[in-house]
Amino acid sequence: MPKKIIVPVGTSKPIAPFSPGTLADGVVYVSGTLPFDKDNNVVHVGDASAQTRHVLETIKSVIETAGGTMEDVTMNHIFITDWANYQAVNTVYAEYFPGDKPARYCIQCGLVKPDALVEIATVAHIGK
């Protein structure tokens, strides 16, 4: 099955050579998603909860554009800049995954823009 590039309306233009999402063989691969507005400015500076919500809404948009739902998510890769934000990220994250939880990991690291506190990359199996 050929791959399909997924670019939801209103998403920011990638700041590097990648697509927001790729659909191949019933699997949606969502690139690392940062709390950016359509002009690649960091939103909700200093607020890990609001940044996490923005990131997850963007991911949701990519998955829905591909024909899936957040219930189709099977794996999340979470990157945070400070463990002090871990609980805030988890609280918002739990709202998006109220039932069975996808596999995931979370690491602390630097991100591409200093005001970004969280980045999430996602895999979803939307079936055939």
Swiss-Prot record:
GO terms for cellular component: cytosol. It catalyses: (Z)-3-aminoacrylate + H2O + H(+) = 3-oxopropanoate + NH4(+). The keyword Hydrolase applies. Gene3D superfamilies: RutC-like. It comes from the Bacteria. One of its GO terms (molecular function) is deaminase activity. Signal peptide: none annotated. Pfam families: Ribonuc_L-PSP (PF01042). Its EC number is 3.5.-.-. GO terms for biological process: nitrogen utilization; uracil catabolic process. It is an enzyme of class 3 (hydrolase). Keywords: Hydrolase. InterPro entries: RutC, RutC-like_sf, YjgF/YER057c/UK114. Belongs to the RutC family. Involved in pyrimidine catabolism. Catalyzes the deamination of 3-aminoacrylate to malonic semialdehyde, a reaction that can also occur spontaneously. RutC may facilitate the reaction and modulate the metabolic fitness, rather than catalyzing essential functions. PANTHER family: 2-IMINOBUTANOATE/2-IMINOPROPANOATE DEAMINASE RIDA, PROTEIN HMF1-RELATED. This is 3-aminoacrylate deaminase RutC.
